[in-house]
Swiss-Prot record:
Homotrimer. Keywords: Nitrogen fixation, Nucleotide-binding, Phosphoprotein, Transcription, Transcription regulation. The modification O-UMP-tyrosine is found at residue 51. This is Nitrogen regulatory protein P-II. In nitrogen-limiting conditions, when the ratio of Gln to 2-ketoglutarate decreases, P-II is uridylylated to P-II-UMP. P-II-UMP allows the deadenylation of glutamine synthetase (GS), thus activating the enzyme. Conversely, in nitrogen excess P-II is deuridylated and promotes the adenylation of GS. P-II indirectly controls the transcription of the GS gene (glnA). P-II prevents NR-II-catalyzed conversion of NR-I to NR-I-phosphate, the transcriptional activator of glnA. When P-II is uridylylated to P-II-UMP, these events are reversed. The lineage of its organism: Bacteria, Pseudomonadati, Pseudomonadota, Gammaproteobacteria, Enterobacterales. GO terms for cellular component: cytosol. InterPro entries: N-reg_PII, N-reg_PII-like_a/b, N-reg_PII/ATP_PRibTrfase_C, N-reg_PII_CS, N-reg_PII_urydylation_site. It comes from Klebsiella oxytoca. SUPFAM superfamilies: GlnB-like. The gene is glnB. The keyword GTP-binding does not apply. Gene3D superfamilies: 3.30.70.120.
Length: 112
């Protein structure tokens, strides 16, 4: 099993969610986050004064999947989240040792 964390632009969330549903992903955790990478921040004008905004709004999607669909999920996220512009985000893939569904006690693949 693998955990996929994807940090994407907020306006791409619906597209990514729908595309993942089409490949069989039925659940995910979504968190509003802020951060920066090579994109750094940007300046905003407020009441005539210019301010530097260091952290940019992003969305973090977390899904846990079986090993056989990891590449499909990663490819789907790339295809739907990519704009070709700086700040499109990153995808991280982690090994998952164990999953337990609290309600039923199901474990591993059955709990996903």
């Amino acid at each position: 099993m693998k955990k996929i964390d994807a940090i994407i632009k907020p306006f791409k969330l619906d597209d990514v969610r729908e595309a993942l549903a089409e490949v069989g992903i039925t659940g995910m955790t979504v968190t509003e986050v802020k951060g920066f990478g090579r994109q750094k921040g940007h300046t905003e004008l407020y009441r005539g004064a210019e301010y530097m905004v260091d952290f940019l709004p992003k969305v973090k999607i977390e899904i846990v999947v079986t090993d056989d669909i990891v590449d499909t999920c990663v490819d789907t996220i790339i295809r739907t989240a990519q704009t070709g512009k700086i700040g499109d985000g990153k995808i991280f893939v982690f090994d998952v040792a164990r999953v337990i569904r609290i309600r039923t006690g199901e474990e591993d693949d059955a709990a996903i």
